[in-house]
Amino acid sequence: MAALVVSETAEPGSRVGPGRGRISRGRLANQIPPEILNNPQLQAAVQALPSNYNFEIPKTIWRIQQAQAKKVALQMPEGLLLFACTIVDILERFTKAEVMVMGDVTYGACCVDDFTARALGVDFLVHYGHSCLVPMDTSVQDFRVLYVFVDIRIDTAHLLDSVRLTFAPGSSLALVSTIQFVSTLQAAAQELKAEYHVSVPQCKPLSPGEILGCTSPRLPKEVEAVVYLGDGRFHLESVMIANPNVPAYRYDPYSKVLSREHYDHQRMQATRQEAIAAARSAKTWGLILGTLGRQGSPKILEHLESRLKGLGLPFVRLLLSEIFPSKLSLLPMVDVWVQVACPRLSIDWGSAFPKPLLTPYEAAVALKDISWQQPYPMDFYAGNSLGPWTVNHGRDPGPRGLGQPASGKVQQGFRGQSPAPACEGCSCADLKAALPAS
C-alpha cells in the first residue's frame, strides 16, 4: 500500500474522515485510469519484478502523471536496491519524467530525504519500504512524496502451522511486524483468534502491529509470548527491550523458521547506566543532530540546548549523517556526547565509542530530569511518550478534518516537524483504520 503526501478532496458522500473507516482497495484502484491499469505493455513490464512484492507501479505512474512531475527520485532501503533499475526503466517508459535513484543508505522511515531530493531539483519523491513516520510541511505545492510500503506476500499457511505447533491452544499471544508484513500479520491474527487469545498491539502513530527499532508498545501482563514476523533481529529487539519479561519468538518468512529469541537485558542496562554515570561528571557536552534524511529532531536538540544552558554546562553542536567513533575522537575536548539520531546506535554500539554516547532519554536521566526507567523505554516516536526528549511528545494527537493539512500527504520541507502525527488523513491512516488494534 502506498501513501501520497498530498491533500485530496473526498468524493461527495464518501465515508472518509475521523473514525469513518477506510477507502477500499477497489476505490483506490478505480482512481487509477483503466488505460494505466489495463495497459498490456505495462503489465508485461511489471512481470520483471517479483510477483509477491507490491511496488504499486500503476499507482506510482498515475501519481507522477497527476503531479506533472518532471524529475522523480526513488529512495529505498538497501534490500530493495536490486529492483531500482527495473523500476526506473518502467517509470521512465510510461511517464514523461526523468527518474533517478538516491543511493545514500536508508535505515528506516526516519531517513526520508526530501531535503536532498529538492536540492537536486526533484519534484516527486517515491520512498519505498517504510510507513509515513515523519510529518512535513504541506505549504509548498511543487514537491510531492509518495510512500510505497512494498507489501510482501508470504506463505501464511506455514506461519499458522508453525504457531500451532509451538504454542498450546488458549495461549495469549501478541503479534508484531514491520510495515511490509502488517497485512499478513492481520490475516494471521484473524485465523488464530479461534484457538488463541491474540492481540495486535499498537503504539500510535504506528499502524496496529507495526514496530520500529526505536518504538514498540508495552504489552499487557497477560501476554504469554510475542511473535515477530520478519527477518533479522533489529525490530524484534525493540519490542524485547520494551517487554523484558515476555518470551519472544521470531518467524522468518524467508527461511520459514520460528525460533525462540533471547536478549541480554542485564548487560545492556548495566552498560547504559555506566555511560550515564560517567556523563554526570562531564564538563563539556557534545550534541549531535543526525542529518541522514529526517533522522534528527531539531525540537529535541533545542530542548537539550535549553537544559544545558540552564545548568550552565558548555556544549558544542555537531551535524553528522552517520556517527562513527573515529569521527568523534577528533574532538577530544568533549566529555560526553548526546546523539539525536537513532537511539539504537547508543544502545547497540555505545560501548564502541571512547566517550559516553547517550540517547536523549539517557541524557535526561544524567541531568536528573527523570529517574532511570524499568523497563527501558522504547518510545522515541510514540505519541504517548515520557518527555520532551522524544520526537512526538506534547503534540496534538487529535485527527485532522477533511481539507486540513496533511490530508493525503505532501510532506514537504520545513526543518521542524508538524504538530500532529504523520499519518492522519492519508492512505496510511486508511490502513490504520482498517487494522484495529486488539
Swiss-Prot record:
[4Fe-4S] cluster binds at C110, C214, C342. Binds 1 [4Fe-4S] cluster per subunit. The cluster is coordinated with 3 cysteines and an exchangeable S-adenosyl-L-methionine. The modification Phosphoserine is found at S418. One of its GO terms (cellular component) is nucleoplasm. Signal peptide: none annotated. The keyword Cell inner membrane does not apply. Keywords: Cytoplasm, Iron, Iron-sulfur, Metal-binding, Nucleus, Phosphoprotein, S-adenosyl-L-methionine, Transferase. It is found in: Nucleus; Cytoplasm. Residues 1-24, 392-414 are annotated as: Disordered. GO terms for biological process: fibroblast proliferation; protein histidyl modification to diphthamide. It comes from the Eukaryota. It is an enzyme of class 2 (transferase). GO terms for molecular function: 2-(3-amino-3-carboxypropyl)histidine synthase activity; 4 iron, 4 sulfur cluster binding; metal ion binding. Its EC number is 2.5.1.108. Coiled coil: none annotated. InterPro entries: DPH1/DPH2 (IPR016435), DPH1/DPH2_1 (IPR042263), DPH1/DPH2_2 (IPR042264), DPH1/DPH2_3 (IPR042265). Pathway: Protein modification; peptidyl-diphthamide biosynthesis. It catalyses: L-histidyl-[translation elongation factor 2] + S-adenosyl-L-methionine = 2-[(3S)-amino-3-carboxypropyl]-L-histidyl-[translation elongation factor 2] + S-methyl-5'-thioadenosine + H(+). The keyword Iron-sulfur applies. Its cofactor is [4Fe-4S] cluster. Belongs to the DPH1/DPH2 family. DPH1 subfamily. NCBIfam families: diphth2_R. Component of the 2-(3-amino-3-carboxypropyl)histidine synthase complex composed of DPH1, DPH2, DPH3 and a NADH-dependent reductase. Interacts with DPH2. Interacts with RBM8A. Catalyzes the first step of diphthamide biosynthesis, a post-translational modification of histidine which occurs in elongation factor 2. DPH1 and DPH2 transfer a 3-amino-3-carboxypropyl (ACP) group from S-adenosyl-L-methionine (SAM) to a histidine residue, the reaction is assisted by a reduction system comprising DPH3 and a NADH-dependent reductase. This is 2-(3-amino-3-carboxypropyl)histidine synthase subunit 1. It comes from Cricetulus griseus (Chinese hamster). The gene is DPH1.
